[in-house]
Amino acid sequence: MYFLMICWHKPGSQAVKKAQHDQHRVHVASGGNGVVRVLTGSALTEADGETDVGNFGIFEAAGEAEVRAFVEADPFTIAGIVDSVEIVRLPDRFKAHRIQPLSS
């Protein structure tokens, strides 16, 4: 199954996010040690295109519980910068083959 995750960060959390960024990238690259397959993702920004306000990801996973487990183990979540998370299942017709995965 495929899922879209939208994560909003707490205002003023940029310094903590920057400090956790490398660990976050390792987590993403491993799919949370194989809990999910990360297809793509990126930061979400203000209209200026620079000020981070969150992030999104598209995942292949056995179910929503696995995506939640991935989010809960993310260094950004552990560091306390996550304000809210929305996880939405994508339709079976989603064309995942068009995306070069970020994790295996």
Region spans (language model):
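Conserved, structured core segments of small domains
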Residues: 1-104
